[in-house]
Amino acid sequence: MLDVSVPKDSFKLIKNLGEKYPSLKTLFEEIDSNLNQNLWYQLSENLISISNKPELPNSKDLIQLYNGLVLFIEPTLNPMKYLEFVQNMLHNYKDKMEEALVFVENIERKNAQKYKGEEKIFIKIIKGFCFLELNKMYELEEVVKNTEQDFSGNIEIDSSLYSQYYKLSTLYYEKKEDYDNFYNNAFQYLAYETKYQTKIN
């Protein structure tokens, strides 16, 4: 089992966020409890739930939660759950997408040897959404084409990743006004998103 050191300030942050968001207080209390008991799987699920709440993307609190907690426990988390939290956290950057891109590229560089298969594809897709927001069409095109090649060589890929990819490629082709590919990818996105939602419900 990995040994991680969580500073006392992390627990203070969790308590403060629970007080700031009364409707989420129970969830923050679960985070505190699971953290104290080293229940990493449950904790990763808690963090995803928090990052999906509509209250937090409109603030800087996900960034604060990342810097004050997630950064310390990242080695214990499932890499895909960690990346899902990172993707949701990027909503906090809003008009600072250049900073978000640098942040994501640093994660990619740090984990170059660790990320294989799904993780490698997911971080590439997250970068693609940054390129989309920054209107960096050449870089986005590279992500779309390279990720499509990645899929062709892998049959064991979760439907959620296909959903993410086809959402990205649909938005890419819409920007290019390539409507044939736009509609083809949009249909694929809807199919995989429906499959993913059915799986988790």
Positions of PLM-derived features:
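Extended alpha-helical scaffold regions
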Residues: 1-201
